[in-house]
Design a protein with these regions (language model features):
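Gly-rich Lys/Arg/Thr-decorated short loops/hinges at beta-loop-alpha junctions or inter-strand turns
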Residues: 248-262, 587-606
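C-terminal polymerase-core module
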Residues: 637-670
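Generic non-transmembrane alpha-helical segments
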Residues: 364, 611-622, 646-654
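Short beta-strand
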Residues: 87, 625-629, 661
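The two-metal-ion catalytic cores of nucleic-acid processing enzymes
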Residues: 1-341, 347-457, 461, 470-489, ...
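Core alpha/beta catalytic barrel or barrel-like domain that forms the active/cofactor pocket
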Residues: 372, 585-592, 624-631
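Active-site-proximal segment of RNA-dependent polymerases
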Residues: 470-472, 601-609, 617
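Active-site palm subdomain of RNA-directed nucleic acid polymerases
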Residues: 369, 608-631
């Protein structure tokens, strides 16, 4: 979400205990604005920064060498500060360039932006993200504001939860595999306290519009010269409504709508009132849900309203470069959420193959769009009403099915990623993990390295990639023993790559670290070494989240003596962690990731191959036949209970990874 030029907002100095849900930069006031959702009033409160925080970036040039920048009107101050260089593992002096406007740092292709003039650090971070990181503000966490001071609020965990955490989690942390166990335990504890905070029911409304068409040509959202013929609504308070515009040549048709759906007709010259009434409804709900609302519904409504002369004071919408938002609320475009591969694969198990509302609804809900067999311009009034309201219904239900699963997931992921919920709903998992790591860098006073600095660590280093167009070798696949096999057990390495990252301290700054004494800590199957002096940031974060999911949330969600609300929370948190963890290795191994480091990616897959091969050898040693193996699982034939227990213990003792029974088959054909 980029700068918002003229948010019209109800800004307040005192806010009751509320969930921080979003943030934006207000271009007009040159300040960050925070949005808090209050579960009791079901409203969003808006608070604008009063701390005097300013945009900035860093340079490794001395302040006197940057003196020429001081002549600029938008440069406030250049001063020396100390930051920790993670690649050299030492504190260094850097120049902090403080400016009046984020555009003075970046955002243009001209010399107006300092990053185009001097080599700079941390100059590609959105200003409102910088603000959140610097103030240790976590989206999805509860805060109250008293006299313009933000005060964190943590709900106390129950005695039962604390006891469960101790028995399931902390008692198992004795052998963490981490360089600094105390730091790791603190990280786990902090995550558990944050993720166990309640997730509120969020009041929201979905919206879908229909527009006149000109033959097969789609309406142009910028010109917006075609009439809005219908707007459908569905809300969390049970409201079901549809506005329909009367036009010449349209038949009334038969009213077969559900009796709970209210139909409101507008005369053909009342399109302006129809849109104004729709805006009135939008203002009553803190969160607006659409399906492709960024690409069509909201920009069309916004531009159509301008064309019809509707006052900007009445219009609650605000258009940005590639998305749409609300001046006093939050807009979630589910098209972009369900297009996210992490959701498609890890949450919804690829139940849909394309991202249309119809395909997603059929796959996830088992429901679909109305089909009258005619184009919408040939439908009757009541067919248009039903068609449009049904789209709003499907859009809303995608957030409400399975006890508000998607909404709850989005809130939990905002907590993990430290990112506004509207950004979470639109951006891929690589952006989530980038935000989380940047937050942790800032918390620890680490200077976020430039891409070329990280690449410089491995300059001139050969690797043994064997697959065309791959920079490093991937996971291992063992050729199957062909034939029909009876009594086959599939054993799965629980979160294998996150486990490897944790146990072997893999992070961009700890693989091939600068310490001579660490070079003897060789990583099997590579020419690399791992740090033995400090926890890597990636290892610490991914490892703590992995342990929480495997040792705590997965087990806790299955306990019998917990409330339905607790079970729902633990299940959702476990799923959110699954999404992050399953995607984490792929993200770290993607060249486009800003903290990508080839040796770390290479070490992760090399260790995966090594663990699989070593486990197969251990199986042979206890006369357990392995029929097949892939990236993180083994098919074993007719195992005894003792053999299963032995191989699980060997994997844990030798490699710090957890092997578990996934499936059991009477027979398999390989």
């Amino acid at each position: 979400m980029e700068a918002v030029e003229d948010f019209k907002q109800d800004e307040v100095a005192n806010i009751p205990n509320s969930l921080l849900i979003s943030a934006a930069y207000i271009g007009k006031t040159k300040k960050v604005s925070l949005k808090f959702y209050n579960p009791e009033s079901e409203k969003i409160y808006i608070w604008e920064d009063k701390t005097g925080h300013q945009p900035y970036c860093f340079s490794k040039m001395a302040p006197e060498d940057l003196e020429f920048l001081s002549e600029r009107d938008d440069v406030i101050e250049i001063k020396t500060v100390k930051k920790i260089d993670t690649l050299k593992d030492k504190e260094i002096p850097v120049s902090k360039i403080i400016v009046t406007d984020p555009l003075a740092i970046g955002g243009t292709q001209t010399t107006q932006s300092i990053r185009n003039v001097v080599e700079s650090w941390e100059s590609d971070i959105k200003y409102y993200e910088n603000y959140l990181y610097d103030n240790s503000l976590i989206i999805g966490k509860y805060y109250k504001i008293e006299n313009d001071k933000i005060i964190p609020h943590d709900f106390e965990m129950s005695d039962e939860t604390n006891l469960a955490m101790k028995s399931m989690l902390f008692d198992k942390l004795g052998n963490t595999g981490m360089t600094d166990t105390k730091q790791f335990e603190e990280e786990v504890s902090n995550w558990a306290e944050l993720l166990n905070q309640p997730v509120p029911k969020i009041r929201r409304m979905s919206l879908d519009i229909e527009v006149e068409t000109d033959g097969m040509r789609l309406p142009d959202v910028k010109i917006a010269d075609k009439k809005v013929t219908a707007i459908g609504f569905e809300a969390s308070d049970g409201m079901k409504r549809v506005f329909v515009l009367r036009r010449d040549g349209i038949e009334e048709g038969v009213n077969d709508l559900d009796k709970n759906i209210e139909v409101v007709f507008y005369e053909k010259d009342q399109e302006k009132k129809l849109i104004e009434d729709a805006f009135g409804l939008v203002k009553k709900y803190p969160v607006l849900i659409t399906y492709n609302g960024d690409g069509f519904d909201l920009p069309y409504l916004y531009n159509r309203a301008k064309r019809l002369g509707i006052s900007e004071d009445v219009n609650p919408l605000y258009m940005m470069k590639d998305s749409a938002t609300l001046t006093k609320g939050v807009h979630l475009d589910l098209y972009r959420t369900f297009s996210n591969k992490a959701f498609q694969i890890y949450v919804f198990s690829q139940k849909y193959s394309d991202f249309s509302l119809n395909s997603v609804s059929k796959g996830v809900l088992g429901e679909q769009k109305m089909d009258y067999g005619v184009e919408i311009d040939n439908m009757t009034y009541y067919q248009i009403a039903k068609y449009c309201q049904n789209d709003a219904y499907l859009t809303f239900k995608l957030t409400s099915f399975n006890e508000d699963l998607l909404m709850n997931l989005l809130v939990v992921i905002t907590r993990i990623a430290r990112m506004p919920i509207d950004d979470i709903s639109r951006m891929g998992v690589s952006q989530w993990i980038r935000s989380l790591l940047y937050y942790e860098h800032r918390k620890n006073n680490f200077l976020i390295p430039r891409r070329n600095e990280i690449e410089g660590k491995s300059a001139g280093m050969a690797n043994d990639a064997v697959i065309k167009d791959k920079k490093y070798r991937g996971g291992l696949v063992i050729e199957p023993v062909e034939g029909v096999h009876f009594d086959v057990t599939v054993m799965d390495f629980a979160s294998l790559y996150p486990s490897i990252i944790k146990v072997n301290n893999l992070s961009y700054e700890t693989v091939r670290c600068p310490h001579e004494e660490c070079k003897k800590n060789a990583i099997p199957g590579t020419s690399h070494w791992g740090c033995t002096k400090k926890n890597g940031l990636t290892s610490l974060i991914i490892g703590s989240l992995r342990d929480l999911r495997v040792n705590y949330y997965k087990s806790l969600s299955k306990k019998e003596n917990i409330t339905d609300e607790e079970r729902q929370l633990y299940t959702v948190v476990s799923q959110a962690l699954k999404v992050i963890l399953n995607a984490s290795y792929g993200v770290m191994g993607a060249e486009i990731f800003p903290l990508y480091f080839l040796p770390a990616a290479e070490a992760t897959t090399a260790l995966g191959r090594y663990i699989i091969m070593d486990t197969i050898e251990k199986c042979k040693g206890i006369q357990l036949e392995v029929l097949y193996g892939d990236t993180d699982s083994l098919f074993v034939k007719k195992p005894t209970v003792k053999q299963i227990d032995d191989v699980i213990k060997l994997a844990k003792d030798d490699h710090g990874v957890e092997l578990e029974i996934d499936k059991e088959y009477r027979y398999v054909v390989l």
